[in-house]
Amino acid sequence: MKRVFIFSVIAIVISLCGVISNEKSEKKPNRVEVISNWGDGTVKEERIYHDGDVVEIITYFENFKINTKGRVKVEGKEEVRIGTWSSFYKNGTHWSQSEYSNGVSDGGYQTWHPNGNPNIIGFYSNGVETGQWKFFDTTGTVVKQYNVTPG
């Protein structure tokens, strides 16, 4: 009797695994849409549609290196920035990175000099500068800093 029960439980688990894996495999793959092209036909801007209402937007320089990259959440006819947004120099090195929540700067903010050294490091909370902000020269030396923590 115990064996029948154990085999029944195993059979149920295996059949449920099949249902779960079928549900996962039925998800639509991300859809990529080219919005615009450069004169030579290379992609200038593309959008990658993820599950739900999240769209990743990537823009490119003429040399096909990434210019900007980030995600938006589509709310009706509006798109609001969410998560990490990055911008790059034409040679591919980071220019800036900032965090967004519901279209508002919220989290770390950083820019870099063309040589890769930090330029500005700071934080936002609900669109307002907060905490310690540091400014660097091209050699990476702090030239200015201030604290904008409320209170």
Report each predicted region and the residues it spans:
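Bacterial N-terminal signal peptides
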Residues: 8-15
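Positively charged n-region of N-terminal signal peptides that target proteins for export
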Residues: 1-4
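Short amphipathic alpha-helical "recognition" segments used for binding
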Residues: 6-7, 101
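Periodic aromatic/glycine/histidine/acidic cluster detector
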Residues: 17-112, 117-125, 130-136, 141-151
